[in-house]
Amino acid sequence: MAPEDTYPELQEEEIDVEAELEKLILEDSEAEAGTSSGETAAEPSPDPGEALKQLQHELEVVRQQLKEKEDAYLRLYADFENYRRRTQREKEEFSQKERQKFVLEILPVVDSFERAQQQLKLETDRERELHNSYQSVYRLLVECLKKMGVSRMKSVGQPFDPNLHEAIARQPSPDYPEDVVAVEYQPGYKLGDLVIRHAMVAVSAGSPSSEPSPPAQATIEAGPENTPASPQNPQPS
């Protein structure tokens, strides 16, 4: 007979003890878990005033960050607007300079047409035909310049202005007072409001001075004794 079969009662008792021990351990574990849950549930809830202060602080932080972002955006927008205006102004200035350069190259051609018109007498059919042919080209040039904003300045009869006129002579004029443009040798032009070529003019020095009259001779008032003899009434001898 095996030794384990010798005392079956003891074996059963040992099994019962082990089962009881496991039961006690399980109950003890459940008790500890319940105690921990009770302690957790017994923890005091946070103060509502403190929670409100914390939320207000966080809100203030968010507002400050938003203000910083808004200021950064406004600075960036202002920089962009300045850049856009600067580039637009530079573009316009470049375009203006290019147009001015082109017009200054065309104006001598216009001057040549006008001088030819003044010199042509139109006495023959050939001259009239030539005049009509170049006048069409002249009008085309003038219209092209007008569309570009070019205008011819009026000089004769206007007060002399160094911003508009270039005086190459000063001469007496019976028609215009002093410091008024009397003769225009070359017309001046504007591109918009900008003077691109000054008019070459002669300025009046005033009316030419008249020759001085001879001094008046003293006259003797005629009396009876100084009355000259009349041919019709000779003096008696």
Curated annotation (Swiss-Prot):
SUPFAM superfamilies: Coiled-coil domain of nucleotide exchange factor GrpE, Head domain of nucleotide exchange factor GrpE. The keyword Nucleotide-binding does not apply. Keywords: Chaperone, Cytoplasm, Stress response. Homodimer. GO terms for cellular component: cytoplasm. This is Protein GrpE. GO terms for biological process: protein folding. Its main location: cytoplasm. It comes from the Bacteria. The lineage of its organism: Bacteria, Bacillati, Cyanobacteriota, Cyanophyceae, Synechococcales. Residues 24-56, 204-237 are annotated as: Disordered. Signal peptide: none annotated. Participates actively in the response to hyperosmotic and heat shock by preventing the aggregation of stress-denatured proteins, in association with DnaK and GrpE. It is the nucleotide exchange factor for DnaK and may function as a thermosensor. Unfolded proteins bind initially to DnaJ; upon interaction with the DnaJ-bound protein, DnaK hydrolyzes its bound ATP, resulting in the formation of a stable complex. GrpE releases ADP from DnaK; ATP binding to DnaK triggers the release of the substrate protein, thus completing the reaction cycle. It is found in: Cytoplasm. GO terms for molecular function: adenyl-nucleotide exchange factor activity; protein homodimerization activity; protein-folding chaperone binding; unfolded protein binding. PANTHER family: GRPE PROTEIN, GRPE PROTEIN HOMOLOG, MITOCHONDRIAL. The keyword Cytoplasm applies. Belongs to the GrpE family. Pfam families: GrpE.
